[in-house]
Each structure stands twice: as structure tokens, then as C-alpha cells.
Design a protein with these regions (language model features):
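Radical SAM enzyme core and accessory elements
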Residues: 173, 202-210, 215-222, 227-230, ...
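Radical SAM/AdoMet-radical enzyme domain recognition
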Residues: 3-134, 138
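C-terminal accessory region of radical SAM enzymes
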Residues: 136-179, 206, 212-260
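Short, small/polar residue-rich loop motifs at catalytic or cofactor-binding pockets
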Residues: 192-196
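Short Pro/Gly-enriched beta-strand edge/turn motifs at strand-loop
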Residues: 178-186
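Short, solvent-exposed loop/turn segments at secondary-structure junctions
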Residues: 29, 54, 91-93, 120, ...
């Protein structure tokens, strides 16, 4: 929304038979005039607004007043009937405010909240030190949050990154590490379903499989392509980028001994490539967070903690065995 021709760009997108599903924003540039122009053009995307915890948003965004601006933008969008999803980074500094933050967002009419473990990206480690939650710490504290949140009476759905989806209205939940159930796995599945449907393009034109990996790829000089130097058509039909996003899960199992010998592989399919790269430096390595989840019994712990609710990712296996 920072671009001076933002509305013209939106208009041209729709003129070409495409549409905008969502807009990611910190809320600063959201004003009534902007929403009026969108409504006039029949444009009503999901507004994904960053909000990183009551009393902590200003610190993470590096600007005094950022929290107030975000809340103002949320209220404005809801008053104009635009759907809102909140994206919240969780770390050791704001962890204790998470439940109150969720209740506030629900009271503002937010449709969904996505809680993201702030991972070990280069800039985060440089600026925040050891504020990132360890993997077991993340699972333990998010499970405490999930159990408490489901009892609040809130209606807002919550996604806990790489862990849980909570649906309080229907009284159900799903475990994200369980990508596939017993009869769903096959070797030809993509290593990441998300990157098959979304292209990450940086302001400089560099293209990446995943926005969360842009900093790591840039730091390593690993650039699969650039839309200012090559056509998007070429990049999506015959390129290094295409080879990377079309990699199948059997390549992970062939490459990584741990995955090859793991009885849980058919459930997680090697896990998240972003986490595997950030935590191990290996594009085809095991995602350590999934090894912790299955190997340390978090499937069973979650079923126990949320036993009052329906688990729509129920699988038949004996959890808690070290891998």
C-alpha cells in the first residue's frame, strides 16, 4: 500500500481478469478513502494486518504508535465489512500477552488469528538475540494457550503456525504436523503445497519459493530467478525456481537418513522446508520441529489437552517414540 499508484495497480489487476485475495499490511496506510475506492471497484480482499501483542507491537515494529495504528485499521476494516485476519509473531517477550491479545482481537470482530513462531531468520537473530522460543517451549506454551483459548467463548478461528488449527465455534481442531493420514501419502506429493500455488517476489524482483525464506536465500546468494530479468512465464515454466517448487517428498526421504528410517514420515512428509533450511541449512533435510512433535509425543499430549473437542486429524499410531 506504500506504492503511490497502489489503487491503479489494483484496478489494472481486475481489468485483466485477475483478483486480489488478500492484502498484507501493518495498517498504517489504511484510511476510509482507500476502502471507499476499493468498494467502488468491487474489491473486497481479506485484510491481513500485523499485530504482535498488546504492549509489544511498537517494539517489534520499531515505531511508537504502531500498535494504535493497527487497532485503528482493524476497527476501520470491520466497520466497512472487510474481513480481517491478524498475524501475530510470538516470542519470549510477548508470550504472556497472547491470550489477552486473542480475546481483544475476537472482540474487534477479527475472523482469524495466525500465531507465528518468530523463527531464526538472520535479521531476527541479529536484533532480538535469544528471544525465539525453543521448539519444545513453543509446543508446550502454545498447547497451554490453545487449551485456555478454547474455553474463553471466543468465536475467532486461530492458526498456530506449524502446530494447530482451532475452531471454537464447531468445537474442533486439527494438528498441522499431520499433513497426511495413513492412506493419503504418496511419493509424488510436493515438498510444500503452499509454494505450488503462491510465488514470493521481493521488491528487487528476486523470486523465492517462500517469503519466510527470502532473507536466508539472499544471505546465501541463492536466487532462483528475478522477474525483472526474466519473464514470469519463463520462471513458472522452465527454470531453477520451477525445479525447486516441484520437488517431491520422495527426494527428502532419499536424501535424509533420518526421514528414510522414520515411521512417522508418511504423516509429516519431512515437514516444513522453511524450518528445515533455517534450522539445518539443508533444503532436503528433516524439519526438526516435526521430529520433536512426533518423537516427543506432542500428538498424544494435544489429544489429552483438548480431549473435549473433536480432532479432525486423528491418526492410528503409537506416539511418543524417539526418532
Amino acid at each position: 500500500m506504500l506504492h503511490r499508484n497502489f489503487m491503479d495497480i489494483l484496478t489494472r489487476i481486475y481489468e485483466r481478469g485477475m483478483y486480489v485475495e488478500e492484502i498484507n499490511t501493518n495498517g498504517y496506510f489504511l484510511r476510509q478513502g482507500v476502502l471507499d475506492q476499493m468498494k467502488e471497484r468491487g474489491i473486497r480482499p481479506l485484510m491481513k494486518i500485523s499485530f504482535d501483542g498488546i504492549g509489544h507491537h511498537d517494539w517489534l515494529r520499531g515505531r511508537k504508535g504502531a500498535e494504535e495504528d493497527a487497532i485503528r485499521a482493524i476497527r476501520l476494516c470491520r466497520a466497512n465489512d472487510f474481513p480481517v485476519m491478524i498475524q501475530t509473531n510470538v516470542h519470549r517477550h510477548n508470550l504472556d500477552t497472547l491470550l489477552e491479545t486473542a480475546k481483544l482481537m475476537d472482540s474487534l470482530g477479527v475472523w482469524k488469528m495466525r500465531i507465528i513462531r518468530t523463527s531464526e531468520a538472520p535479521r531476527w537473530k541479529e536484533n532480538a538475540g535469544d528471544a525465539a522460543l525453543g521448539l519444545t517451549e513453543y509446543y508446550d506454551r502454545m498447547l497451554e494457550f490453545a487449551s485456555a483459548y478454547m474455553k474463553t467463548g471466543c468465536r475467532m478461528d486461530v492458526i498456530i503456525w506449524q502446530f494447530l488449527r482451532l475452531y471454537p465455534v464447531s468445537g474442533s481442531y486439527g494438528m498441522i504436523p499431520v499433513l497426511y493420514r495413513e492412506k493419503e501419502y504418496r511419493d509424488s506429493l510436493p515438498v510444500c503445497k503452499g509454494v505450488r500455488g503462491m510465488v514470493a517476489v521481493a521488491a528487487n524482483g528476486n523470486i523465492f519459493p517462500c517469503h519466510q525464506l527470502s532473507g536466508t536465500y539472499e544471505l546465501n546468494g541463492d536466487i532462483p530467478g528475478n522477474v525483472k530479468k526474466e519473464s514470469l512465464k519463463h520462471l513458472l515454466s522452465a527454470s531453477q525456481y520451477l525445479c525447486e517448487v516441484c520437488t517431491t517428498v520422495d527426494k527428502i526421504r532419499e536424501h535424509d537418513r533420518k526421514c528414510r528410517n522414520c515411521k512417522y514420515f508418511k504423516y509429516c512428509a519431512g515437514g516444513c522446508r522453511a524450518l528445515a533450511i533455517v534450522l539445518t541449512g539443508d533444503k532436503l533435510g528433516a524439519d526438526p520441529s516435526k521430529c520433536v512433535f512426533f518423537g516427543q509425543g506432542y500428538y498424544e499430549k494435544t489429544v489429552s489437552a483438548l480431549q473435549e473437542y473433536e480432532n479432525y486429524t486423528e491418526i492410528a499410531y503409537n506416539p511418543g517414540i524417539d526418532i
